[in-house]
Structure formats: C-alpha cells, structure tokens
C-alpha cells in the first residue's frame, strides 16, 4: 500500500503529525466499507497518535477499527496500551487478554499484561501471567524478568535474584534485565553486590548508557557521590557534548551545589531538547534553587515543565514533579488532567515517593480521600519494611538499670530551619538529671551556628553528610537509645526510611510531617488534645499526647526584635488587607474561591501574597486570575516576593487567611507572633488541625471555623471588629506568653515527663 509506505517514511523523517493526518484523511475517504488493507492504516494511525501523546484519540480510532476487524490481536494489543495510558487499567488488562486468546502466539500482548500487573503491584497475578508467558515464549527474557520484579514486590529477594539471573543468562545483552537485577540489590541496601552486578553488565554492554547510568545510580544510593562525580567528570573531558553525562553529573551534584548542577542540566537540555526527563529534572532543580534571583528560577522551572508536557506523557515520578510546580503556579486546570487522587497517590506510594504523598495531603477533599491517603502511606510503609527483612538489624532492647534515659532526635533540620524553631526548647531546657540526648543529622551543608549550638548542648551529635539508610540505622542502634524521635520525614536530606530498621526500642515521629508516616515500625506520633484526630483510625501510630500543646514557640524563630508597627494596616491605608505567607502547595481552587468570597464580603479589601513565588510572572498571573474569576478586581491582589525575611510584611496584613485542608503551622505561629490573627478551617485529620492547635493554645480558639461558610463569616466579623484587631496587634505577644504555645520551658518539661513515663512503662 503506497500511501502507508509514504506515511511511514514521513514518520521516519520526524513528521509524525503530518503522517497521521494523511492516514486519517485516507481512511475517511474510504467511507464505511474500507478495503482490507485499511486495517494496517488504522493500526499505524492509532500507533502514531498514541506516540504523539493523544491516548484518547488513539482509543477512539481503535474502537472504530475493532468494529471492522474483529478479534485482531494487534489492534487489541494496541487498544490495551491506549487504555493503560488513559489509566483505565482493568480495561487494558481485558484487551491484552482478548489479544492473547485471539492468537496464542501474540505474546507481546501477554508481556504487556504482565508488565501492567507488575506496575500495579498485583504480584500474585503477575507471577501467574509471567509463568504463562514463560511457557508460551521460553526464550523471552521478559518472562523471568517479570517474575523477578513480582517476587521482589513480595519481599522475596532470593527468588527475585534467581529469576533476574535467569533473564540475563537467556540474553546477556538485555539491558532492562540487568538494570532490574542491579536495582534489586540496591533497593535492599546490598551495595557491594550491586556494584559487582554493574561490573558484569558493563563487560557485556560496555557502551550502553543505561548500564553506565545504573553504575552512577548505585554510587549515589551507596552515598558515594564523589566517586560518581569523578567518573562523570572524566567522561565529560573525553566527550564535552555528551548530553547524558551532563545530565548525570547534574543529578549527582545538584543537591550539594545547585548553581553548578543547573549549568549541567541546562547544557543537557540544550544538547537533547526532546527529552522530557531531562526537562523535568531541570525544572525540579530550578524550583529548588535559592541562589541569585529565586523568582527567576521559579519561573524558569515552570516554563521547563510546560516544555516537558509538550513532549508526551510523563512517567508517574515526573508527574509528581510537574504537579508540584504547576500547583505552585496555580495551574489547577492542567493539574486535574494529570490523574486521579487515588491513582496518582498509589503510583507514587508504589514507587517509594513519600515526599509526593506530603504534597498530596492538600488535595484531600472527602472522608474517602482521608482514608485513601492513609492507605497510600501504608503502601509506602509496607514496601520500605519489606526491604529490611532480608538484611535486617536486630531491634534493640530497652536497657534496664541505667541511671538516665537515652533519648535520640533524628533530623537533618537541626540548623536554621523551621523545625528547629520548635525543637529548640528541648535543647535549651534539657532535663539533665534524667536524660542523655543524642542527635543524628544527615545534612549535606556545613554546620551553621544553630547546629553548632545544638551540638554543644547534647551528649552526642552524630553528623554524616552521606550515609546509606541501613548504615544510619546501625549507627543509631549502637548508641543503645531508649527512645528515638524522627523530626524530618521525607523532606530534603532527611531519612525517614531509617525508621523501618527499628533502630531503637521505642520510636516516635514529631514535627516534620503532619500525618502518619506510613511505617508500622514507628510506635508513636506526638499530638495534643486539639491536633489529635477525633477518629483514631486516621492515625497508624499510637498517640503520644502532650497535655497542652504539641509545640511551643522557641526563641529561635520568634525573635522579640521583630518590630510590630503600632498602627494596624487598615487604619494606615483605609482598607482591610487579608493575606497569606503559606506555601502554595497548600492552595487549591476551593481555597482561592473561599478567600475570594471573603474579599467580596468586605468592600475595598485587598489580598496580599507574601511568597518567593510572588516575583514569578506565572504565579502573579494565575493567582490574580483565580480572584478575578470569582468577581474580585485584579487591582485588589497584591504581591511581595520575599524569602526568609518575610516577618516584616505581617505589618501590612490585618488578617491572615489559612489554607485548607492542610493548614499552616509555622506560618500560623509567625502571624500571631506579629499580632496578626488567623482564620482557620478545622477538619478531622491531623494535617487539618495544626492551626486549630496553635490558635487554641494561644487563646484564639474562637478564630477556628468548622465550615466554609463559618470561615467566611469569622473573617468578615473580625474585619469589622477594629477594636479587637487593634488590641491584638499590641497585646497578642504578651497573651501568647501566658498560654501553652508561648511557654517553651513548660513545653520541654511536659515533653521530658511524657518520654520518661513512656519509657518507664515499657521497661
């Protein structure tokens, strides 16, 4: 068929769009009874459209083709691929089954089915499907490779490695089998074995980039960043225009040197502009960049995401990056096209992307979502616990007869960081009569004065810039702690996974994460009477309930030298200024529309965003648009671009409006410390109650609303109450000091008392 050959030639020249248009026009010209050879035209049209990133269009073409060519295995297999891209997984599995039933030699469909089952972590079904594939196509290395991945998911490393070895024996040149074999060792912290596997693979495939990339991955996972950097630097000396080497060097050094890393990311996308993975990692790095003009980096990161989205569908781990950056810019119109709450969350959990679940909290809308995200955390936790079973550490026992309780605090944020704002009372007021305190940090930065101060206050401060998870757990276990608190979760440079190894007899999480982490190995989560969910099934851990407050405002983040202007903004300006300093990942269309409702109820009022993003053109555009769409004029929306030195801008706000469902925490405390009251919306889960706790423990519990309408009403009422706002501006700091939130010494006493009680009861 000459036309088809012409179209395939066009595609080979990079003109896939034009080729697809020609095929579509030819098919349409043949009417309802196309000739027999049109089957191939339908197939290639759907394939091209699918590769152009239009799975819905491909599915539509395939549905018409299946109506004409019944039980065609190629069309059915491609239909399964289209359904998979559309995340219609059950439908995809059905198409793959139909294709294999139609023709038992259609093992490509069976392989696609097995791969999808592995990706869905339906490991038992994947084993059955892979065994069928193995029988149908015994020389296909994909079958034992799928078996290896399925057994790996079941925590059976022995069988997983057996099947991976079988796969590489069947075809020593099969790159994916080698990569999966290497990743299995790496995931189970068997770094020496992983390096041996890499060396064997390189002998078989000395020029294969993906194997060399696996070598770099092993170095990084083993904490051998310098070895990885040196290897890549040598490679770039030999081939300075190697896009892959620039990209991998950026991946290796960006966490330590963001500016130098970005230069290599930029060079990688210049050399290979059609690689969406390169663009997404560059975007992610720009989004984290603090040097120079941060707003320029934020804007450039957003533009890099938009470029990546033009290059086709993104894998789920890159959807996570795209989602975070798009939410940051207020592009909720694009975010809703990326996938459902359930599908995305489970995909991220299955890929061990715990930090993605943190950002997912703000997308919760219903009770079903609350339990769903809890299950997503459990999925992540089960995977991490499974990794420890084949190379376990013995769980330490409580030491009896020791004079003092040995308390551990693990966080890479024991430095100038919001975590230390609230942790500092524990170091300022150590109960030395009863406790020895050990700290553990994996921070990659050199010690700042705050870290140096904390180190001077505790018995031991163990600081390691690069250490593997199991090694970190073993280091902690050797200290024979009685109880260990984890304060960082999955935020940058922290090692939540260490808690899966049971490094202490009793363990707890606090401060760094507003939800159960997901690990059954963590015994407690620190709460207070306000933050503790009314439904205990919304937590995985037992409640470690403080008598009054879960935090206190220490001297570090709440400096009396921060000046409060004596005259409230509305008296100076003639209008009410609402505002927020909350992170935009907590924003949603519902949050913005509720804030807009408040402005509509308070004539001439304005809204002030105090955020680093405020200097980015896209942020200003889409935040303003959200208010304009609700009937609020654009000139009522104000922006101040600032990082770090934002406290003075509370002098320009009359009232802070909180985010929901994930509320503020640090920002709520900062706002009221500056005399600016906060209106919050209280929900049922932990992350929906942070501000409720802070306000209640500051004597402002009446500012907590329990419905959207109540939120608007309380904001409007407070805007009208000039007398109260004037009083709070001058008196709120004193009021806080008389309440639990402002009493760090009492907080430290309550904390140490509760730890002592818990440890002594366990003994």
Regions from the language model: what does each represent?
Residues 677-686:
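Short hydrophobic beta-strand element within catalytic cores of glycosyltransferases
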Residues 1-575, 625, 629-632, 644-653, ...:
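Alpha-helical solenoid repeat scaffolds of the TPR/TPR-like class and their adjacent stem/linker regions
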Residues 657, 671:
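Donor-sugar nucleotide-binding helix/loop cap in glycosyltransferases
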Residues 426-433, 589-603:
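Short hydrophobic signal-anchor/transmembrane segments that target glycosyltransferases
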Residues 688-699, 704:
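Short acidic/histidine- and often glycine-rich active-site loop of Leloir-type glycosyltransferases
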Residues 672-673, 696:
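Short alpha-helix at the nucleotide-sugar/activated-sugar donor binding site of glycosyltransferases
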Residues 440-446, 606-621:
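Glycosyltransferase donor-sugar binding loop
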Residues 488, 658-664, 682:
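Short Ser/Thr-rich beta->loop micro-motif in glycosyltransferases that lines
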